[in-house]
Amino acid sequence: MANRNDSRNNRRNKDDIEDQLVAVNRITKVVKGGRRMRFAALVVVGDKKGRVGFGTGKAQEVPEAIRKAVEDGKKKMINVPKVGTTIPHEVIGHYGSGNILLKPAEAGSGVAAGGAVRIVMDMAGISDVTSKSLGSNTPINVVRATIDGLKKLRTSEEVNKLRQPERA
C-alpha cells in the first residue's frame, strides 16, 4: 500500500523534475446562495540533484489545484549548494513567525526533520541533515522558511570569493 501511495504523491516528468504533495486545504467562500468550495494545494518540486522549489495552486478540483501548484513550483526553483550528502553549514530560515534551524549531519545519519522539511530536503537531494522547527508549524510557513534557509546557504568557495577583494 505504501508503494501505491508514493506513486500517487510523487510523479516523475520527462524533464526529470519530481513533485510531491505537501498539503491540500479546502477553502470555503460564503455567498448568497450558500457555500462555494475550492481547494488549495501546496507542492514541492525538485530534481533530487540540488534544485528545489515550491508552488501553490487553487482550483475547484484537487487535481487542477495540484497541476497549478506544480507549474508555479517549476517557475520558482532555486539551486541548493551541497557538500556530499549534506548542507555546507548551519542556517536559520525565517518566514512570518516560522523559523527552521538546519544543521549539517554526518553521512549516513539521514534526514532528522518533520514532514514538510523532510519533503523539501528529499526533493533537493539532501540526505543527511538535522532540523528543528520553531514558531509557526503550518505547512506553507514551514516550507517557505525551509526554502529561505536553503537560499542563505553558501559554499566555502563563495564565501572566500566574497572575502577576497579583487586586486587590480
Curated annotation (Swiss-Prot):
Q: Record keywords: Signal included? A: no
Domain of life of the organism in this record?
Bacteria
Write out the GO biological process terms.
Answer: translation
Presence of keyword rRNA-binding: yes
Q: Which InterPro entries match?
A: Ribosomal_Su5_D2-typ_SF, Ribosomal_uS5, Ribosomal_uS5_bac-type, Ribosomal_uS5_C, Ribosomal_uS5_N, Ribosomal_uS5_N_CS, Ribsml_uS5_D2-typ_fold_subgr
**PROSITE patterns to which the protein is assigned, alphabetical:** RIBOSOMAL_S5, S5_DSRBD
- S5 DRBM domain residues are 17-80
Q: Which GO terms describe its molecular function?
A: rRNA binding; structural constituent of ribosome
GO CC annotation, single? small ribosomal subunit
Q: Which Gene3D superfamilies match?
A: 3.30.160.20, 3.30.230.10
Q: Which HAMAP family match?
A: Ribosomal_uS5_B (MF_01307_B)
Q: What's this protein's function?
A: With S4 and S12 plays an important role in translational accuracy. Located at the back of the 30S subunit body where it stabilizes the conformation of the head with respect to the body.
What's written under domain?
The N-terminal domain interacts with the head of the 30S subunit; the C-terminal domain interacts with the body and contacts protein S4. The interaction surface between S4 and S5 is involved in control of translational fidelity.
The similarity comment for this entry is:
Belongs to the universal ribosomal protein uS5 family.
Official protein name in the record = Small ribosomal subunit protein uS5
Q: Which organism is it from?
A: Lactobacillus helveticus (strain DPC 4571)
Taxonomy of origin reads: Bacteria, Bacillati, Bacillota, Bacilli, Lactobacillales
Q: Which gene encodes it?
A: rpsE
